[in-house]
Amino acid sequence: MSIQENISSLQLRSWVSKSQRDLAKSILIGAPGGPAGYLRRASVAQLTQELGTAFFQQQQLPAAMADTFLEHLCLLDIDSEPVAARSTSIIATIGPASRSVERLKEMIKAGMNIARLNFSHGSHEYHAESIANVREAVESFAGSPLSYRPVAIALDTKGPEIRTGILQGGPESEVELVKGSQVLVTVDPAFRTRGNANTVWVDYPNIVRVVPVGGRIYIDDGLISLVVQKIGPEGLVTQVENGGVLGSRKGVNLPGAQVDLPGLSEQDVRDLRFGVEHGVDIVFASFVRKASDVAAVRAALGPEGHGIKIISKIENHEGVKRFDEILEVSDGIMVARGDLGIEIPAEKVFLAQKMMIGRCNLAGKPVVCATQMLESMITKPRPTRAETSDVANAVLDGADCIMLSGETAKGNFPVEAVKMQHAIAREAEAAVYHRQLFEELRRAAPLSRDPTEVTAIGAVEAAFKCCAAAIIVLTTTGRSAQLLSRYRPRAAVIAVTRSAQAARQVHLCRGVFPLLYREPPEAIWADDVDRRVQFGIESGKLRGFLRVGDLVIVVTGWRPGSGYTNIMRVLSIS
């Protein structure tokens, strides 16, 4: 039977009557034709021969290459293996529960890629010690260059946020605000460290002017809500609408109020200078409302911090409405769902999440999904079913990174939380509808005369067509790796670089596995290229996603330096 005759006979049959193995006939293996422009049918025997032992490519393969989205959903198989190597990066917040060197080593082994320091809490001395601990933990893996794991350090600014003061029992104490009781919200400095169940201090002096009678004050991600009854000389007299346990330094939201805080406070500027001095890789800029807020952060970093990536956190209605202008000047976006879910209706947060992730994917910029992803694991060893679905759906939406906050900063199970996110992400990545995703990204890509971008598109398409197990890219700044990530290859992108900062920062990009190559350059350029490519291959074998007989796509430059990536070749692993 000819291939064309085989196509006709297959089209007459319903997919329901086929085994999943037979449905794998409809996969991407290189010849043009079909609705996507590059699809043809192949026999099961040919499929097996083409794929060989390329385990990395076979997870949820029938679903990934289905003809329609509905068919893709129907073909998802709970018995299919997860992907061999997780593509989505995990950001873990470092706090009292996780800042020891030994605990950090465990978290790195569990899958932490980026360590986040929340500058809403802690002194500069505290964070300097945390940074030193992270670097000590990372360097403990430096014995073998093949198993070394670069970990980026991110500084999360306080931003123009409002917080409560410290309770009179100390920073670790808690009080319960009972529903129906009266609470005075004050800006009197005398209560800054003497808060209690009757009086709550906040660090925003103008709160008495911007919140009217009947207005609401939300505390601790909206868990506690107060309704203003009277505006008095000492502050706002409120009634507890929704009670709860209040700790120190909790976030305060004033939805609908015209908060007149500057985009960057003096404390933020000091924190950013501290970050530059201590060599942080990423800044998470809080409460970004417009493009000029990002420019202010860039100016505060100064020329010494020009290489630091700025990820803008979208946390309010204005930020969502001005998203495009913020995205244009940012290195990436964080969907910060905590404050966002208070500033806009909670039932609309998922719309904002999907919109922002989609626009970031189209623009080729990293996007982080954050807040309450595994919140129950602060106190419990296992997440709720809804939380596991939330993490998986963030991955399916297209997030480059998923973040843990209190789960690792103060939770009882920080290592277990990282392991759980790792496991969920592996399963979700296998279930991505790769055929549709790549075709849409390629179709939406603007025309370009940039050799690096053109090479990246060609490399990803070639990887799909030959079912390559990996794309190995030699990169100086990480840009080539980010361009490859933009088109969401099903294969791993192994980025080999001599730049330690680039190796850490590419963790922001989905599917990129950075390798820091420490050997000095060879006198002959071609020899140096071959050594770095071989280093990438050996690392891929060691990590379990390259096997003998697999095909890999190699992307390199034609000369040393940045901006010369324009060569692609196909190698077979021997």
From Swiss-Prot:
<dbReference type="GO" id="GO:0071872">
    <property type="term" value="P:cellular response to epinephrine stimulus"/>
</dbReference>
<dbReference type="InterPro" id="IPR015793">
    <property type="entry name" value="Pyrv_Knase_brl"/>
</dbReference>
<keyword id="KW-0225">Disease variant</keyword>
<feature type="site" description="Transition state stabilizer">
    <location>
        <position position="313"/>
    </location>
</feature>
<dbReference type="GO" id="GO:0004743">
    <property type="term" value="F:pyruvate kinase activity"/>
</dbReference>
<dbReference type="InterPro" id="IPR036918">
    <property type="entry name" value="Pyrv_Knase_C_sf"/>
</dbReference>
<keyword id="KW-0670">Pyruvate</keyword>
<keyword id="KW-0464">Manganese</keyword>
<dbReference type="InterPro" id="IPR018209">
    <property type="entry name" value="Pyrv_Knase_AS"/>
</dbReference>
<feature type="binding site">
    <location>
        <position position="157"/>
    </location>
    <ligand>
        <name>K(+)</name>
    </ligand>
</feature>
<keyword id="KW-0479">Metal-binding</keyword>
<dbReference type="GO" id="GO:0001666">
    <property type="term" value="P:response to hypoxia"/>
</dbReference>
<dbReference type="GO" id="GO:0032869">
    <property type="term" value="P:cellular response to insulin stimulus"/>
</dbReference>
<dbReference type="GO" id="GO:0030955">
    <property type="term" value="F:potassium ion binding"/>
</dbReference>
<keyword id="KW-0360">Hereditary hemolytic anemia</keyword>
<feature type="binding site">
    <location>
        <position position="118"/>
    </location>
    <ligand>
        <name>K(+)</name>
    </ligand>
</feature>
<dbReference type="InterPro" id="IPR001697">
    <property type="entry name" value="Pyr_Knase"/>
</dbReference>
<dbReference type="GO" id="GO:0048029">
    <property type="term" value="F:monosaccharide binding"/>
</dbReference>
<feature type="modified residue" description="Phosphoserine">
    <location>
        <position position="2"/>
    </location>
</feature>
<dbReference type="GO" id="GO:0000287">
    <property type="term" value="F:magnesium ion binding"/>
</dbReference>
<dbReference type="GO" id="GO:0016301">
    <property type="term" value="F:kinase activity"/>
</dbReference>
<dbReference type="GO" id="GO:0033198">
    <property type="term" value="P:response to ATP"/>
</dbReference>
<dbReference type="GO" id="GO:0042866">
    <property type="term" value="P:pyruvate biosynthetic process"/>
</dbReference>
<keyword id="KW-0324">Glycolysis</keyword>
<dbReference type="GO" id="GO:0005524">
    <property type="term" value="F:ATP binding"/>
</dbReference>
<feature type="modified residue" description="Phosphoserine">
    <location>
        <position position="26"/>
    </location>
</feature>
<keyword id="KW-0808">Transferase</keyword>
<feature type="binding site">
    <location>
        <position position="120"/>
    </location>
    <ligand>
        <name>K(+)</name>
    </ligand>
</feature>
<feature type="binding site">
    <location>
        <position position="116"/>
    </location>
    <ligand>
        <name>substrate</name>
    </ligand>
</feature>
<keyword id="KW-0630">Potassium</keyword>
<dbReference type="InterPro" id="IPR015813">
    <property type="entry name" value="Pyrv/PenolPyrv_kinase-like_dom"/>
</dbReference>
<feature type="binding site">
    <location>
        <begin position="475"/>
        <end position="480"/>
    </location>
    <ligand>
        <name>beta-D-fructose 1,6-bisphosphate</name>
    </ligand>
</feature>
<feature type="binding site">
    <location>
        <position position="525"/>
    </location>
    <ligand>
        <name>beta-D-fructose 1,6-bisphosphate</name>
    </ligand>
</feature>
<feature type="binding site">
    <location>
        <position position="315"/>
    </location>
    <ligand>
        <name>Mn(2+)</name>
    </ligand>
</feature>
<feature type="binding site">
    <location>
        <begin position="559"/>
        <end position="564"/>
    </location>
    <ligand>
        <name>beta-D-fructose 1,6-bisphosphate</name>
    </ligand>
</feature>
<dbReference type="InterPro" id="IPR011037">
    <property type="entry name" value="Pyrv_Knase-like_insert_dom_sf"/>
</dbReference>
<feature type="binding site">
    <location>
        <position position="371"/>
    </location>
    <ligand>
        <name>substrate</name>
    </ligand>
</feature>
<feature type="binding site">
    <location>
        <position position="250"/>
    </location>
    <ligand>
        <name>ATP</name>
    </ligand>
</feature>
<dbReference type="GO" id="GO:0005829">
    <property type="term" value="C:cytosol"/>
</dbReference>
<keyword id="KW-0418">Kinase</keyword>
<keyword id="KW-0067">ATP-binding</keyword>
<dbReference type="Pfam" id="PF00224">
    <property type="entry name" value="PK"/>
</dbReference>
